[in-house]
């Protein structure tokens, strides 16, 4: 089982987040509290990440490896480097030569991805962009996401899927994991102001 270097990346994320995290243009809120804390939450065994779906990712890339030994992989949205770590491990285990691009609207997870890529001596392109804006068109064989749809308003999801389709080459695949909450309101899950205030001293 892949062991991510969380003990090293947690203090790095905490340091980077106040410097790199952006403010939402509509609310003025920064995502620094989230990106700065997320690695520590994972160290405590809280939340979900690709580590819980490593077997699924390995099997999915194993199926692709039957017919495709070289591929362009787009990681669409990233809380940290976990998706890159597990997709890279899956590709290596199946002898796939992959080139990676990570897209997110915040520089903190992109910098964490660059940090991990450098540790693993793997080439990585990054793009700081909203996933609802245009993605690099028609250049990728595989698009990967994890727990993304809950962060996208239902009204915006058709546009997101259109961008996914345009980012993929003909016959390209989407490999994704997303939690389903039957019977719950179709809104993003969110923290209440109280725990947020614990993590953000400025509040």
PLM-predicted stretches and their roles:
Residues 70, 140-141:
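Local beta-strand N-terminus motif with an aromatic residue
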Residues 107, 154-158:
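Non-membrane alpha-helical structural segments and their capping/turn regions in soluble enzymes
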Residues 158-170:
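A short glycine-rich, Lys/Arg-flanked "PGG" loop and its adjoining helix->strand segment in the class I
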Residues 144:
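A conserved beta-strand element that flanks and buttresses the S-adenosyl-L-methionine
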Residues 147-151:
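Short catalytic micro-motifs in class I SAM-dependent methyltransferases
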Residues 1-135, 175-203:
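Class I (Rossmann-like) S-adenosyl-L-methionine-dependent methyltransferase catalytic domain
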Residues 84-85, 152-154:
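Short N-terminal helix/helix-N-cap motif within the alpha/beta-hydrolase-1
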């Amino acid at each position: 089982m892949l062991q991510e270097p969380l003990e090293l990346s947690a203090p790095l994320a905490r340091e980077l987040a106040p410097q790199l995290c952006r403010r939402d243009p509509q609310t003025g809120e920064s995502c620094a509290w989230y990106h700065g804390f997320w690695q520590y939450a994972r160290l405590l065994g809280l939340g979900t990440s690709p580590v819980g779906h490593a077997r699924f990712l390995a099997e999915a890339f194993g199926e692709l490896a039957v017919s495709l030994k070289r591929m362009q992989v787009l990681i669409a949205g990233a809380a940290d480097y976990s998706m890159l770590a597990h997709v890279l491990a899956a590709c290596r285990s199946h002898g796939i030569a992959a080139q990676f691009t990570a897209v997110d609207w915040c520089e903190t997870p992109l910098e964490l991805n660059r940090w991990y890529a450098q540790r693993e001596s793997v080439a990585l392109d990054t793009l700081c962009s909203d996933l609802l804006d245009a993605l690099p068109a028609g250049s990728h064989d595989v698009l990967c996401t994890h727990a993304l749809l809950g962060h996208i308003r239902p009204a915006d999801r058709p546009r997101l899927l259109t961008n996914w389709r345009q980012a993929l080459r003909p016959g390209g695949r989407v490999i994704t994991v997303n939690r389903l909450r039957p019977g719950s309101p179709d809104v993003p899950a969110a923290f209440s102001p109280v725990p947020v205030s614990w993590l953000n001293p400025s509040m």
